[in-house]
């Protein structure tokens, strides 16, 4: 008998290849015949795993991440689609900066160039508000636009304006969790601590994000659902992509 072993990463500890390496040692010692296959949920390090299965690099280019650093960012050809792993630009390993000082606005520069975006492995907790601020939605304090809003600025937001440049986006998003953005078991409570959030900061985000999304829902004259499964991926980025921008969320 031969055993097939499929291994994903153990976030924050081992890559899928490292997991396979440890299992191989045990199987070899016990003379167990096996075949090994790295797998991915579309999150962090998914680019490397896709390449192991023959998907080719579409482009390697220098992009600015959420901390301001210029990094080589890789997109892949996946069947007839262009794929990007968003953690390359907003990943938890990119910086030690506080997540309240970070947002997703850097993704606005790549979203038009790809067909599929993957979630997971982020340090962000901005519910995609940073990205939305670059996609035609202004977040204001009274009549003053808050440029590039970050979570630390959320308490200042008391008005929202939808500009003519705002439009829906016909693309796909791979999400690696069923956790909602808001609710009892929300993204801030579940993933916030591993991104350095204190309990007081989690409560701050819950309160202000819900308030801001109510403003946004009223301004769009649309029912936005931050309690829907899967809207909490990458600090709520999947909410902004799916509920506001209209991308299709695919659970994997």
Residue ranges, per PLM feature:
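N-terminal beta1-alpha1 ligand-phosphate binding loop
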Residues: 6-22
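Hydrophobic alpha-helical hairpins/lids featuring a short glycine-rich hinge
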Residues: 78, 82-118
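Carboxylate- and glycine-rich phosphate/diphosphate-binding segment that chelates Mg2+/Mn2+
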Residues: 86, 144-145, 149-152, 171-236
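A glycine- and small-aliphatic-rich helix-loop capping segment at beta-alpha/alpha-beta transitions
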Residues: 22-26, 53, 128-141, 190
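Glycine/threonine-rich beta-strand-loop-alpha-helix active-site module
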Residues: 102-112, 116-119, 123-170
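Extreme N-terminal starter segment of soluble prokaryotic enzymes
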Residues: 1-4
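Glycine-rich nucleotide/cofactor/substrate-binding loop typically near the N-terminus or early
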Residues: 25-94, 171-181, 188, 238
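Conserved small/polar residues in nucleotide/adenosyl-binding loops
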Residues: 250-252
């Amino acid at each position: 008998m031969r055993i097939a072993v499929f291994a994903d990463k153990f976030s924050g500890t081992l890559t899928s290849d490292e997991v396979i390496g440890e299992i191989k040692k045990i199987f070899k010692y016990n003379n167990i015949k096996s075949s090994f296959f790295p797998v991915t949920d579309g999150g962090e390090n998914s680019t490397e795993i896709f390449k192991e299965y023959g998907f080719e690099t579409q482009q390697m280019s220098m992009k600015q991440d959420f901390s301001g650093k210029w990094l080589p960012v890789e997109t892949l050809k996946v069947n007839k689609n262009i794929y990007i792993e968003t953690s390359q630009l907003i990943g938890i390993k990119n910086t030690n900066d506080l997540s309240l000082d970070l947002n997703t606005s850097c993704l606005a520069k790549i979203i038009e160039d790809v067909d599929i975006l993957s979630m997971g492995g982020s340090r962000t907790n901005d519910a995609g508000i940073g990205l939305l601020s670059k996609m035609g939605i202004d977040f204001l304090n009274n009549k003053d636009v808050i440029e590039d809003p970050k979570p630390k600025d959320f308490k200042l937001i008391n008005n929202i304006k939808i500009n003519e440049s705002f439009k829906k986006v016909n693309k796909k998003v791979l999400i690696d969790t069923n956790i909602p953005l808001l609710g009892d078991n929300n993204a801030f409570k579940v993933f916030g601590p591993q991104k350095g959030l204190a309990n007081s900061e989690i409560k701050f985000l819950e309160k202000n994000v819900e308030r801001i999304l109510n403003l946004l829902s009223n301004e769009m004259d649309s029912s936005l659902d931050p309690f829907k499964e899967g809207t909490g991926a990458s600090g709520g980025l999947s909410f902004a992509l799916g509920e506001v921008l209209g991308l299709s969320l695919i659970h994997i």
